[in-house]
């Protein structure tokens, strides 16, 4: 911004008429105000694209946007943080208990911590993706068999007095990871997960599973993928046959509509926060054609979650009360590439790869 200030001063000095010079200076300053605001608003996320990104010697705001667009995980962190903030604004206006707001904030911190820690493990051993998917499927099946029963639905486990929904935490990551790892073990894991959703039963999560696998099958039909899709469709059909009698929970279910009864701004916050969840998929789809499978799965998984919340008494992801979806969204970012290769050469890609290790160190700082 200092360079812009010097340019304005030089241009003003060349204008002989004092009135015109003053008007030019004022017009230029007003034009810079949006850049100044953007610079300060984006500063918490500067660590995601490198130190000094917003300094006078570093990137301009436009450069920041360009660099951030090549980092899907960084975009996801920013969107998750903003969506949680909008959800907190809604709950605050709606009169939700302060404990609800605190739980969502803690869930965001946990999600970002896991994103940083687990991200390093995945870099060290990506070959274990199939086994990881199978292990998560086992956890979902255990929940269906041993979890808390609420009006015939067995979707939750209790930890320290809190109920968490493992399917909201694990299933999005499983689907997006399956876009990049479709071996026999991963396929078996997806089939077990589909069975778990039918046993629970959980219509919303079964629909999320079918939506994510469906878009993958359309983009790249393969034997393992078709088998997993068939199981997910059967699971979703099974949940449709069984009645879902759970009542709506305040600040959790149906808030895409009820928020407008509180205030128009509260409704706009809920809708805006929900839309932010899809931004990483949209940006990644346009910027990184080589990994479109992952972005499509990510986008359809969370779109299905939002649609389920709109159509029935199911949790509204991120913007409603509940930490499971917040943690699940953060974990699902693990399956997205850290750095896209769009618009960069071989040397720049190598430099970008070198940046991925320090990027992990800054995930929590950027999220704060």
Where are these regions (language model features)?
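Short, low-complexity, charge-dense intrinsically disordered segments
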Residues: 10-20, 25-39, 45-49
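Membrane-helix boundary/helix-loop-helix interface segments in multi-pass membrane proteins
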Residues: 76-79, 83-187, 194-200, 312-317, ...
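Hydrophobic alpha-helical transmembrane segments
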Residues: 106-111, 265-282
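Short aromatic-rich membrane-water interface segments that cap or initiate transmembrane helices
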Residues: 155-168, 254-268
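Hydrophobic alpha-helical segments of polytopic membrane proteins
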Residues: 181-195, 203-237, 329-333
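Helix-loop-helix junctions and helix-breaking kinks within/between transmembrane helices
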Residues: 193-216, 240-247, 260, 311-321
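Membrane-interface helix-loop-helix junctions at transmembrane boundaries of multi-pass membrane enzymes
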Residues: 283-299
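A juxtamembrane structural motif centered on a specific transmembrane helix
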Residues: 331-368
């Amino acid at each position: 911004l200092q360079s812009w200030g010097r340019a304005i001063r030089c241009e003003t000095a060349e204008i002989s008429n004092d009135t015109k010079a003053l008007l030019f200076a004022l017009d230029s300053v007003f034009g810079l105000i949006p850049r100044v605001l953007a610079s300060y608003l984006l500063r918490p996320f500067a660590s995601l694209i490198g130190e000094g990104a917003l300094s006078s010697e570093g990137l301009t705001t436009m450069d920041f946007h360009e660099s951030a667009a090549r980092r899907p995980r960084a975009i996801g962190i920013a969107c998750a943080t903003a969506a949680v903030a909008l959800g907190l604004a809604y709950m605050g206006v709606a009169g939700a208990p302060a404990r609800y707001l605190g739980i969502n904030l803690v869930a965001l911190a946990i999600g970002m911590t896991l994103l940083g820690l687990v991200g390093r493990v995945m870099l060290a051993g990506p070959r274990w993706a199939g086994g990881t998917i199978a292990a998560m499927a086992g956890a979902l099946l255990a929940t269906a068999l041993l979890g808390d029963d609420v009006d015939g639905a067995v979707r939750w486990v209790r930890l320290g007095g809190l109920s968490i929904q493992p399917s909201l935490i694990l299933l999005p990551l499983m689907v997006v990871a399956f876009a990049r790892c479709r071996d026999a073990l991963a396929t078996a894991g997806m089939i077990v997960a589909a069975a778990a959703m039918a046993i629970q039963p959980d219509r919303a999560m079964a629909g999320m599973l079918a939506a994510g696998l469906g878009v993958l099958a359309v983009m790249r039909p393969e034997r393992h993928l078709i088998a997993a899709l068939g199981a997910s469709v059967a699971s979703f059909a099974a949940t449709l046959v069984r009645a879902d009698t759970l009542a709506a929970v305040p600040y959790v279910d149906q808030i895409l509509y009820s928020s407008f009864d509180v205030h128009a701004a509260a409704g706009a916050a809920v809708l805006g926060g929900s839309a932010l969840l899809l931004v990483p998929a949209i940006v990644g789809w346009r910027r990184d054609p080589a990994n479109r499978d992952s972005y499509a799965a990510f986008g359809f998984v969370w779109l299905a979650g939002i649609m389920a919340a709109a159509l029935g008494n199911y949790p509204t992801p991120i913007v409603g009360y509940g930490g499971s979806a917040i943690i699940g969204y953060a974990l699902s970012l693990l399956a997205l590439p850290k750095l896209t290769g769009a618009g960069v050469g071989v040397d720049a890609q190598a430099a970008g790869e070198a940046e991925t290790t320090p990027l992990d160190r800054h995930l929590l700082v950027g999220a704060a």
